[in-house]
């Protein structure tokens, strides 16, 4: 989901030399990935009042303004830094909207329906059966529906790490860095989340992933 790091490093070097075009190119290259990340996590109640594209624009504007600080002190890979800005923006937005509405939004943030259907189907297929009957299209739709429901029913930490691994396609080491965990701890959290997801989906069927 996130752009390759080699060209990103070249653009960061150019941005560090004061090239404004490089900063703009960095933002453009990462815009779609930020949009997907925001769509995955934007609460439906908030999404009814706030356009996701506005959130993305705010995140990229903040990143542009703070680019000098990042280039001088890159505490983490650029895409992880950018997604952290987006995550902080979403947390603040949900907090402000809860206060404005004077009501509680579910502590377990529900997924927006705009996340990648293909990624969800791929993971659902891994967790369930690998062989489809002749009514493949119907089964795939059923898998998607069941997977979306199961993912929504997970605890926030479990859902987050599955999104990071299967929607954002982050490696275990990237997840560990983003969550400030050791790599073994990140791996164990991911396996725990998969177990819980399989329990919801029904892990007693054949063809599930081993743990």
Regions found by a protein language model. Give the residues of each.
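A short, charge-rich alpha-helical start-of-domain segment used by transcription regulators
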Residues: 2, 6, 14-39
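Sigma70-family region 2
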Residues: 13-17, 40-47, 58-78, 96-98
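Amphipathic, Lys/Arg- and hydrophobic-enriched alpha-helical face
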Residues: 27-50, 65-69, 151, 200-203
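Σ70-family region 2.3-2.4 aromatic/basic alpha-helix that recognizes the −10 promoter
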Residues: 31-35, 53-64, 75-99, 103-108, ...
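Amphipathic alpha-helical segment used for protein-protein interaction
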Residues: 34, 113-160, 170
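Short, basic/polar amphipathic helix motif occurring as a linker/hinge flanking DNA-binding modules
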Residues: 46-53, 77, 94-126, 208-209
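C-terminal edge and immediately downstream basic/flexible tail or linker adjoining helix-turn-helix-like DNA-binding
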Residues: 47, 112-114, 178, 194-211
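DNA-recognition helix of helix-turn-helix
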Residues: 147, 158, 164-167, 172-203
């Amino acid at each position: 989901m996130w752009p390759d790091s080699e060209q990103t490093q070249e653009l960061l070097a150019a941005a560090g030399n004061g090239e404004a075009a490089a900063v703009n190119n960095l933002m453009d290259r990462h815009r779609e990935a930020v949009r997907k990340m925001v769509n995955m996590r934007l609460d439906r109640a908030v999404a009814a009042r706030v356009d996701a594209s506005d959130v993305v624009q705010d995140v990229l504007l903040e990143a542009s303004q703070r680019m000098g600080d990042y280039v001088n002190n890159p505490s983490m890979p650029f895409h992880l830094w950018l997604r952290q800005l987006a995550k902080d923006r979403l947390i603040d937005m949900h907090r402000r909207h809860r206060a404005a509405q004077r009501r509680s939004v579910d502590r377990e943030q529900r997924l927006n329906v705009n996340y990648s259907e293909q990624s969800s189907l791929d993971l659902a297929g891994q967790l369930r059966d690998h062989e489809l009957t002749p009514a493949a299209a119907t089964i795939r739709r059923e898998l998607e529906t069941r997977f979306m429901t199961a993912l929504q029913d997970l605890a926030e930490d479990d859902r987050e790490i599955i999104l990071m691994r299967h929607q954002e396609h982050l490696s275990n080491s990237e997840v560990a860095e983003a969550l400030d965990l050791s790599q073994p701890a990140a791996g164990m959290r991911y396996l725990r989340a998969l177990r819980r997801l399989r329990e919801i989906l029904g892990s007693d069927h054949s063809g599930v992933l081993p743990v």
